[in-house]
């Protein structure tokens, strides 16, 4: 069965230098502050978490009231410009999230997120994507875009 790979892209200019933005995302505990409260997101891996290629981070969350575990593996780690996390256990068949940071001439940073994901489940997964998942992901990343600037100030 072919995978139906979807892509979510977001860009945001942030009023902070690239080192400050990377430092924010280099600490997985900050994910709790930029994830909507409805998801009841919590990092399970004990702090401090030494980030780098091969780091495994475990989370707990609720999707539509369903409790689940999500394990993320850091696949690429290139401070302060880029890192990639992939889901190794969780609700998606594929979750590949590339974070890219580009310094701008005015001292700000352009943050780019590219998420490639697949739900699996064939036609049922396609229906769930159209009805629920795409909208949920857009809302999660919109919330994040609203929260990140406050954490950098």
Where are each of the predicted segments found?
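Generic structural detector for well-ordered beta-strands
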Residues: 11-15, 42, 60, 73, ...
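Glycine-rich portal/gate segments that line the openings of hydrophobic small-molecule binding cavities
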Residues: 42-89, 110, 143-151
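Beta-strand/loop substructures that line and gate deep hydrophobic ligand-binding cavities in soluble
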Residues: 84-139
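Short, surface-exposed coil-to-beta transition loops
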Residues: 7-9, 67-71, 94-98
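Hydrophobic ligand-binding cavity/cleft-lining segments
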Residues: 1-52
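Generic C-terminal helix-cap and adjacent flexible tail
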Residues: 4, 150-153
């Amino acid at each position: 069965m072919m995978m139906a790979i979807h892509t979510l892209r977001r860009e945001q200019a942030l009023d902070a230098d690239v080192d400050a933005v990377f430092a924010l995302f280099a600490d997985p505990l900050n994910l709790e502050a930029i994830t909507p409260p409805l998801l009841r997101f919590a990092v399970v891996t004990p702090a401090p978490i030494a980030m780098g290629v091969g780091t495994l981070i475990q989370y707990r969350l609720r999707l539509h009231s369903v409790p689940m575990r999500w394990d993320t593996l850091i696949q690429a780690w290139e401070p302060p410009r880029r890192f990639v996390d992939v889901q190794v256990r969780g609700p998606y068949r594929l979750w590949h999230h590339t974070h890219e940071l580009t310094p701008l001439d005015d001292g700000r940073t352009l943050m780019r997120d590219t998420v490639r994901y697949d739900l699996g489940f064939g036609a049922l997964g396609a229906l769930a994507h159209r009805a629920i998942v795409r909208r949920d992901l857009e809302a999660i990343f919109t919330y994040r875009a609203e929260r990140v600037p406050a954490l950098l100030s």
